UniProtKB/Swiss-Prot annotation:
GO terms for cellular component: cytosol. Pfam families: KH_1, PNPase, RNase_PH, RNase_PH_C, S1. Mg(2+) binds at residues 485, 491. This is Polyribonucleotide nucleotidyltransferase. It is found in: Cytoplasm. GO terms for molecular function: 3'-5'-RNA exonuclease activity; magnesium ion binding; polyribonucleotide nucleotidyltransferase activity; RNA binding. Its main location: cytoplasm. Keywords: Cytoplasm, Magnesium, Metal-binding, Nucleotidyltransferase, RNA-binding, Transferase. Residues 552-611 form the KH domain. The keyword Metal-binding applies. Belongs to the polyribonucleotide nucleotidyltransferase family. Involved in mRNA degradation. Catalyzes the phosphorolysis of single-stranded polyribonucleotides processively in the 3'- to 5'-direction. It comes from Clostridium kluyveri (strain ATCC 8527 / DSM 555 / NBRC 12016 / NCIMB 10680 / K1). The gene is pnp.
Length: 708
């Protein structure tokens, strides 16, 4: 019988079964939390992959719609490629684990997290994070440091570990913390302008719970853990390394002290050519090894400059932001544009406003079924001056787009205030670090230019870190550029407003961050963010008073909910006819609110009138001007409103006897009619003679009033 090991996290049971499933995997296990169950399988190749200069770790997060009792939409009716949310979850699992593998380990490692059952009170991504760490610890793969993961919410001023669905809906913070028992490894957050001190307290609150989960994983590891494989670590031939360093170290060092990037890169390119000329004969098959040595030499020099000389490659102070320029409204036909430049990083963001029917439909394991605001991020090869095929967005592009989207989401106006679907596209035109944060800035500029009444402008900043070997010295860098990102120990991205933080994402290349480092980074990021916001304010201080003349206009009206069927009609016949006649887009909400969107105001007004006519209450005793639509031998049918017809019986057509209806009216005639009855089947009975009589009486009364 399989033994299930369990612990308690936030008052709920976390269970692990290490022997029930995945017998042929290096480690196959089930991990459950409440009714959420995730299958974890971890495997590694027997030998290192040849010809690469990176660690090939692959995290796959597989959502199965049967986990929530759904059948996939579309024609195929099975799961296809991972959803954006699944990709984001996979990236989040990867980040805290990758730095904890041995340096030089180049075996392929794959961890597959398959979501089998979802209880909406217990998030499957958090369960998968803990399961991935534990599976690697139990396996023979050389990974020995458990990582605990929790979600943290903030409700009524109180922190909550792994908030349930009700608490998540009320929470002003959606924070994920991953940590070993000693240090924080990774943080992701979306927040409603949470101040820095509260954000720091939330991270530490989550860290304390992560420690307990990491200790629990250690217990499971002791009981079920396999003997670890001896890793075959990549190492450059010592003689080759000594020769390359001796030949190139001083030249590279001189080059790294050149402040101008173009000039520095030109010198470094010349050094590469000299290296090839020098070592092409003796080490013809070791080009990748030479490149690895050169990379490590550059890294050593840049880190030495920062730690020992307190000097950055581009000459800036540690807390200095690169030069900033902002521009809006430069694409004439776009609904809103923002061009944000920071140093050699440049991002153009374009806003498109659409109807509420343009929302993105989501088909995943969560409760959210549509998205009205979306942000997409493109990173073409030309942004770094390179040549490569242009394909669809990769995981990195999806991740960066989601981060910028998260930073602005709490600032987007509600549907009732601004009834548009909003799509932002950030095009990276030039990249020298921190493009995701430049996307936040560019998006803010574009939204303001488009006339979107966002709550407050937001900006983003990427912070870096370099540490000594023993971690005793820590130097925090503001607004890191490319080299500082490549050779540094941390990428700490913070987005927010002048009031507080709206998004965080940080990960490290070392074994975690100290509490002191996290606190200082948040404080310095705030200072930089306020500086950037002031620069942006100088460009466009507030949103435009109106949306672009090229953007569609939205008109809103409300009808009784029981009249919705009259507007839609059988099989959508009525609403489709209105759309065809007027060229508008129509969205109807369950509460009877109707949104009519059109680039042509006349078309919108026509559609609104038709809907008003369709839904206006017909009152007994009221007189209407109607059009004769059909004649029978017993009377005439008259349309008094769009789609509303009544019968004028032949006896009600005139004061005298009528032998033929055609003697009084013809099809197409406009006549006054009075509603004399609406029967219990909703049929409307009309009278022409009563309408004439009442009209004549009204005219006489008006004449009498004038005489007096």
């Amino acid at each position: 019988m399989n033994e299930v090991i369990q612990t308690t996290v936030a008052g709920r049971t976390l269970k692990v079964d290490c022997e029930k499933v995945g017998m042929l995997s290096n480690c196959g296990m089930l991990i459950s939390y409440g009714d959420t169950v995730v299958l974890i399988n971890a495997n590694a190749s027997d030998k290192p992959r040849e010809g690469i200069d990176f660690f090939p770790l692959s995290i796959e997060y597989e959502e199965r719609l049967y986990s929530v009792g759904k059948i996939p939409g579309g024609f195929i009716k099975r799961e296809g490629k991972p959803s954006e949310k699944a990709i984001l979850n996979a990236r989040a699992i990867d980040r805290p684990l990758r730095p904890l593998f041995p340096k030089g380990y180049r075996n392929d490692v794959q961890v597959v997290c398959t979501v089998l059952s979802v209880d909406q009170d217990n998030l499957p991504n958090i369960v998968a994070m803990n399961g991935a760490s534990l599976a690697l610890c139990i396996s023979s793969i050389p990974f020995i440091t458990p990582v605990g993961s929790v979600a943290v919410g903030l409700v009524d001023g109180n922190f909550i570990i792994n908030p349930n669905l009700e608490d998540r809906e009320k929470s002003t913070l959606n924070l994920t913390v991953c940590a070993t028992k000693e240090r924080v490894m990774m943080v992701e957050a979306g927040a409603c302008e949470v101040p820095e001190d509260i954000m720091y307290d939330a991270i530490i609150f989550g860290f304390e719970e992560c420690k307990k989960i990491a200790l629990f994983q250690e217990e499971v590891m002791k009981k079920y853990g396999k003997k670890k494989d001896e890793p075959d670590l990549y190492k450059v031939n010592e003689d080759l390394e000594e020769e390359v360093r001796g030949f190139a170290f001083d030249m590279i060092k001189d080059a790294m002290y050149i402040v101008d990037r173009d000039e520095r890169n030109k010198v470094l390119k010349d050094i590469d050519e000299k290296l090839e000329e020098q070592f092409s004969e003796d080490y013809a098959d070791n080009k990748s090894d030479i490149a690895d040595v050169v990379y490590r030499v550059k890294k050593e020099i840049v880190r030495g400059m920062l730690l020992k000389e307190h000097r950055r490659v581009d000459g800036r102070e540690f807390d200095e932001v690169r030069p900033i320029s902002c521009e809006v409204g430069f694409l004439p036909r776009a609904h809103g544009t923002g061009l944000f430049t920071r140093g050699l990083t440049q991002v153009m963001t374009v806003v498109t406003l659409g109807s509420l029917g343009d929302v993105q439909i989501l088909d995943g394991v969560g409760l959210e079924d549509s998205k009205r605001y979306m942000h997409h991020y493109n990173f073409p090869s030309y942004s770094t001056g390179e040549v490569r095929p242009l394909r669809g967005p990769g995981r990195r592009e999806i991740g960066h787009g989601a981060l910028a989207e998260k930073a602005l989401e709490p600032l987007i106006p509600m549907e009732e205030q601004f009834p548009y679907t909003i799509r932002l596209v950030s095009e990276v035109l030039s990249s020298n670090g921190s493009t995701s944060q430049a996307s936040i800035c560019g998006s803010t500029l574009a939204l303001l230019d488009a006339g979107v009444p966002i709550k407050r402008p937001a900006a983003g900043i990427a912070m870096g870190l370099v540490t000594s070997e023993d971690l005793s010295q820590e130097e925090i860098l503001t607004d890191i550029q490319g080299l500082e990102d490549f050779f540094g120990d941390m990428d700490f991205k913070v987005g927010g407003t002048e009031k507080g933080i709206t998004a965080i994402q940080f990960d490290t290349k070392i074994h975690g961050l100290s509490n002191k480092c996290i606190k200082e980074t948040l404080e310095k990021a705030r200072t930089a963010r306020l500086y950037i916001l002031e620069k942006m304010k100088q460009c466009i201080p507030e949103h435009r008073a109106e949306v672009s003349k090229y953007a569609p206009k939205t008109y809103i009206m409300s009808i009784p909910p029981d009249k919705i069927r009259d507007v839609i009609g059988s099989g959508g016949k009525v609403i489709n006819k209105i759309i065809a006649e007027t060229g508008v887009k129509i969205d109807i909400k369950e509460d009877g609110k109707i949104f009519v969107m059109s680039e042509d105001s006349e078309g919108a007004k026509k559609a609104l009138k038709i809907i008003d006519d369709l839904t206006r209450e017909i009152l007994v005793g009221e007189i209407y001007l109607g059009k004769v639509t059909k004649i029978t031998n017993f009377g005439a049918f008259v349309e008094i409103h769009k789609g509303k017809e009544g019968l004028v019986h032949i006896s009600k057509l005139d004061f005298t006897r009528v032998n033929k209806v055609e003697d009084i009216v013809s099809v197409g005639d406009e006549i006054l009619v009075k509603v004399i009855e609406i029967d219990n089947q909703g049929r409307i009975n009309l009278s022409r003679k009563d309408a004439i009589k009442d009209s004549e009486k009204k005219e006489q009364n008006e004449k009498d009033v004038q005489k007096k």
